[in-house]
A protein has these predicted regions:
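Individual transmembrane alpha-helices with interfacial aromatic-anchor signatures
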Residues: 52-53, 128-151
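Interfacial loop at the N-terminal end of multi-pass membrane proteins
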Residues: 2-84, 109-133, 173-176
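Hydrophobic alpha-helical membrane-insertion segments
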Residues: 12-21, 89-106
Length: 183
């Protein structure tokens, strides 16, 4: 069971980190290349990027909750208490992902619609569009900073998960839960 838990934990961390690398360096920037802008001009390329980004956040939520479940299962079966650093890495990345997907992304969506109000058949003054463009740039920078923190944190988490660590001391998983006392 412990080898399965180890394999599961490494798989979750690798998928989580790998998806972040793929989206950050390959998929995300592809929406804003000259080739893409010829196929799908602004603001529609940004709208398509938003759709993909929403799925990216769902993947982050799933991986985050699976990583937390793995930490709990590893503690229950091996008796090893997860280190604070590992718990903070998983909790921090999951928290940033929830913040990005549930608060920041809708904010950017709204600002993009005001910025390109004419394309979306909305009414907005030139000042509102200009303010939305400025705010969008600032919040997009915040989003990129958060993504950088997520990237580095997941890299550290993956490095921690692939290390075998020390065996549990003075704790037998069977005795921990009193399962050796069969009546």
């Amino acid at each position: 069971m412990l080898s399965f838990l180890r394999f599961f934990g490494v798989t979750v961390a690798a998928v989580w980190f790998g998806s972040t690398v793929f989206f950050t360096f390959f998929a995300g920037p592809a929406f804003f290349t000259d080739e893409m802008k010829k196929l799908v001009p602004p603001p529609y390329n940004g709208a398509i990027a938003e759709l993909v980004l929403s799925r990216y956040f769902i993947l982050h939520y799933i991986c985050g909750f699976l990583a937390l479940a793995h930490l709990g299962a590893d503690w229950m079966y091996s008796g090893k208490i997860p280190t604070r650093v590992t718990v903070w890495l998983v909790g921090g990345v999951l928290g940033l992902s929830l913040l990005g997907g549930l608060w920041l992304q809708p904010k950017l969506h709204q600002l993009q619609h005001v910025k390109y109000a004419d394309h979306y058949r909305l009414t907005a003054t030139a000042q509102q569009r200009e303010a939305a463009a400025k705010d969008f740039g600032m919040w997009h920078g915040v989003s990129q900073t958060m993504n950088g923190l997520v990237f580095l944190s997941l890299w550290l988490y993956l490095a921690r998960v692939i290390q075998p660590g020390d065996p549990a001391r003075f704790v037998s998983p069977i005795n921990k839960f009193g399962l050796d006392r069969r009546a």
